[in-house]
UniProtKB/Swiss-Prot annotation:
Its EC number is 2.3.2.6. It is an enzyme of class 2 (transferase). Keywords: Acyltransferase, Cytoplasm, Transferase. The keyword Transferase applies. HAMAP family: Leu_Phe_trans. This is Leucyl/phenylalanyl-tRNA--protein transferase.
Length: 234
């Protein structure tokens, strides 16, 4: 196994099975963040992740963290909170604000460079990247964004500026996604937060099998149209 240098003249990627074991999942470097290359990466179970000043690094870790949306872990305290939720949740109303919110989050944001922001803006404009927003009155207090692959959603990052805001984003999205035929959410690498919400590790080979099937599914035509997913507790 060796690290592959990508060409700027081809969007081809090596097989994810050739990724390094240490650091886990590092597959390639270089290339660019063009929409065509990013979409090719997601279709093959690969994603970019790098720090400012570093070359573009491409990853496909083993194991892979995933969440079956119908298995979202709703704790009793979160259930009580959601029943009285002060939040309104929307879809694709403020993609730019959400990715900027994720970029400014101290825990998650070091890797969301200006080039990443521009690249995912392009994917959003092309209808491939999507955001979920959590509002308290007219203030954005949390959200998440990711890339759609049929009935699989590749979650990229989330942020929270108020109690349970990011949990609310994921909970409401899981409910809407499941109801419309969504099957799986890619969480990339398991952490304490996503594990507490029901995410689990599966072998990379299994993830790639799910991806190859689910990316061929089609959600209802209007699923990604900007709309209100949750109006707040009534």
């Amino acid at each position: 196994m060796r690290l592959v240098q990508l060409s700027r003249h081809s969007i081809a990627f090596p097989s994810p099975e050739g990724a390094l074991r240490e650091p886990n999942g590092l597959l390639a470097l270089g290339g660019d963040l063009s929409p065509a290359r990013l979409l090719m990466a997601y279709q093959r179970g690969i994603f970019p992740w790098f720090s400012p000043g570093d070359p573009i690094l491409w990853w496909s870790p083993d194991p892979r963290a995933v969440l079956w949306p119908e298995q979202f872990h709703l704790s009793r305290s979160m259930k009580r909170f959601h029943q009285r939720s002060p939040y309104r949740v929307t879809l694709n109303h403020a993609f730019g604000e959400v990715i900027e919110g994720c970029a400014s989050d101290r825990d998650e944001g070091t890797w969301i460079t200006s080039s990443i922001v521009r690249a995912y803006h392009q994917l959003h404009e092309l209808g491939h990247a999507h955001s979920i927003e959590v509002w308290q009155e007219n203030t954005l207090v949390g959200g998440m964004y990711g890339v759609a692959q049929g009935a699989l959603f590749c979650g990229e990052s989330m942020f929270s500026r108020a109690e349970n805001a990011s949990k609310t984003a994921l909970l409401v999205f899981c409910q809407a996604f499941t109801q419309s035929g969504g099957k799986l959410i890619d969480c990339q690498v398991l952490n304490n937060h996503t594990a507490s919400l029901g995410a689990v590790d599966i072998p990379r080979r299994d993830y790639l099998d799910y991806l190859s099937v689910l990316r061929g599914y089609r959600l209802p035509e209007l699923f990604w149209v900007p709309r209100v997913l949750f109006p707040g507790a009534q």
